[in-house]
């Protein structure tokens, strides 16, 4: 099985940005832990971008069996990501590092959740 993990804006700052919300674990440490768990069972690829257009292109070009997407701030604003997910034949699972429903009200709504296989 091939799994593509896509990480959106500011996730490159994990470990230093708002540790009270996101913790002190870096994105590289998360990637390492996932690779270790998947070893011998799945081929894992990670990508991170602060650019919405680049994320859209990666979704459009995905050659994997499943995508795991942390769209970060784009979760609540990006019609472009929603449309790219809708157009893709690859199932997408939306993930977050914090509970978006327990945060500021503007974070409660996900534009991408309705077109993902799970949240």
Language model: regions and residue ranges:
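Mid-chain, well-packed structural core segment of small domains
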Residues: 66-103
């Amino acid at each position: 099985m091939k799994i593509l993990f896509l990480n959106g804006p500011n996730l490159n700052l994990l470990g230093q940005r708002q540790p009270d919300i996101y913790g002190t674990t870096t994105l590289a440490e998360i990637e390492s832990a996932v690779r270790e768990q998947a070893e011998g069972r799945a081929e894992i690829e990670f990508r991170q971008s602060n650019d919405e257009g680049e994320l859209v292109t990666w979704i459009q070009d995905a050659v994997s069996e499943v995508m795991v997407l942390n769209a970060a701030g784009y979760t609540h604003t990006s019609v472009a990501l929603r449309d790219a997910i809708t157009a893709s034949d690859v199932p997408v699972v939306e993930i977050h590092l914090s509970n978006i429903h327990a945060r500021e009200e503007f974070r409660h709504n996900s534009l991408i959740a309705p077109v993902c296989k799970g949240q």
